[in-house]
Amino acid sequence: GLTVEGEGGVLTFIARQHFSKVEGAFDSVLLVCGLGTRSVRDAALSAWLKKMAGVRRLGAVCVSSFLLAEAGLLNGRRATAHWKFGRELAKQYPEVRVEHDPLWVKDGNIYTSAGLSAGIDLALAWVEEDCGVGLAHEAARELVLFLRRPGGQPQLSVSLASQASAMMSIR
């Protein structure tokens, strides 16, 4: 396998094969990448992603949206990314209609999410699309999630901000 160093050197992944060797028919493809993804310019990867664009669902978690944008797959489409990187995405790829607030966005068969936890919300939406709301709730329960969040919910939580303010006033 191919060794892939995780962000910050904390995790190492072993890939079974290089993306260019992956073939076959896929129903759904979900990209989950690290922060370095924002500067990736790889023609072979862009070509492979264009081949994958015909799947029923193509998704990108957090900064993986940059890979879809680089491949031209987000041109004219609505998309999101983590709140820290939305402006950068919009500046680098002005043809993408970047939405800065939602947790995740669906535009046609392409889904983008704001961050890792928003990626969980997106994955649960896919489970609901395929298997119904009951199984999606069961999966959320197994993951010990406090609640399931719809895609249109804001990235920056008012509840979290209130909680942080309350904690600061206690100290």
Question: What is the predicted role of each segment?
Answer:
Residues 1-58, 66-70, 100, 128, ...:
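Extended, subdomain-level signal for the structured scaffold at the beginning of enzyme domains
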Residues 68-83, 110, 127:
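Short beta-strand and adjoining strand-loop segment in the mid-core
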Residues 75-103, 138-139:
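A conserved active-site-flanking secondary-structure segment within enzyme catalytic domains
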